Amino acid sequence: MTLIKSISGIRGTIGGRAGDTLNPLDIVKFTSAYATFIRRSNQSKSNTIVVGRDARISGEMVKNVVCGTLMGMGYDVLNIGLATTPTTELAVQMSQAAGGIIITASHNPRHWNALKLLNHKGEFLTKDNGNEVLAIADKEDFEFADVDHVGKYKEESFNQRHIDSVLALKLVDTEAIRKAHFKVAVDVINSVGGIILPELLDALGVEYTFLNGEANGDFAHNPEPLEKNLSGIMAEIRKGGYDLGIVVDPDVDRLAFICEDGKMFGEEYTLVSIADYVLSNTPGNTVSNLSSTRALLDVTTKHGGVYTAAAVGEVNVTTKMKEANAIIGGEGNGGVIYPESHYGRDALVGIALFLSSLAQKKCKVSELRATFPEYFIAKNRIDLTPSTDVDAILEKVKEQYGKEPDVQVTDIDGVKLDFPDKWVHLRKSNTEPIIRVYSEASTMEEADALGKKLMQVVYDMQ
């Protein structure tokens, strides 16, 4: 049983003892701490907090505890019901609320759930803000409202407003999409994508077949949108008659595509392809995290923009995007952030922009994929003992490779070594005694060999 506390919220498995899992007592504690932080931060005059959730089986229970606690803290609750993460983020903006809580464990298995915390802009809390919430929770330093100041409760859907905001984006070419008469297969893994994506696709004139479309939270397969989990939709597309496949995770902030031949487009290339379309229409800068493909750098340079890398984590990417004045950014796991809409990963925005690009180019998805540089990312891990000084090891790696003239060393998040034609990124886990090793090259064999080489370097340093 697990309970993990981080700056972005808390996540854990359902059931078990208080303090060890995500259970009602801990939900009350962290919700109260968040409400206390919002009150003290005084960033908004609003007394309303938005609550949205994915379709997980435990979601109704968690939602009831969260909403009751917020009301007990004196906040009015705007419950938007079964909603995607980006819908909840936009609802905070549109309602000018004081903040928001998203109840979702994203791509984690069905027995997990989590509270993700938003500020008054509908964006994830900064590291300092997140640490403040954790400190308040540790001290249990909160005060509940008296009977005359208990919060009110309201339910309202924001799905249509989210869809309308996507359709209103200048680069979403609804006319071209409708004329293309696309037929798609969509895997929404038994969650909220099954509620909102049919409405979006109907508005775009796209014919569709849904797999795992019932939003019951009983995930038909591992919910992370990786090739190893997507045999069902890949087989469906291979039957023929489809222009592409669309895959989202349970809270619809990650997006993957499948080519018309049933092969993966590549989750790293979701952002790359959409950025290429955006940059071709509105030149500018881009940002992705350090573990994302170099293809975004190539595409950005092609269009005359500047690429900047950020530390892993959505809040780090959005912060860097604002600093760099980036017009698009995100993460290589299929997370697309388009500030013209909002500063959050949004699969609805990604779908609409991708279909616009495809409709205008009048090509097959596999042909579009072939226009981008070919890179492969290998993922490995180094298991360490709990007593290992991981920071000291990473510092040694930095010192060793910092002396080499053809290696660019970046240390804002672990250590990343950029070689002329490949890179490797070493990050320590915040929850386990391990170092994650990501490496990229022009072939998978070369990428894996580079990762294994750095793993041996680390082993030799112990």
Predicted regions mapped to residue ranges:
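Phosphate-binding and adjacent anionic-ligand microenvironments
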Residues: 244, 282-462
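Short glycine-centered, acidic/aromatic-flanked micro-motifs in structured strand/loop junctions
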Residues: 52-53, 186-188, 259, 340, ...
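Gly/Ser/Thr-enriched, mixed-charge loops and adjacent short helices
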Residues: 13, 113-238
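An N-terminal, well-structured beta->alpha segment
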Residues: 1-68, 72-73, 152-184
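Short beta-strand-to-turn element immediately C-terminal to the catalytic PLP-Schiff-base lysine
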Residues: 117-120, 256-260, 337-339
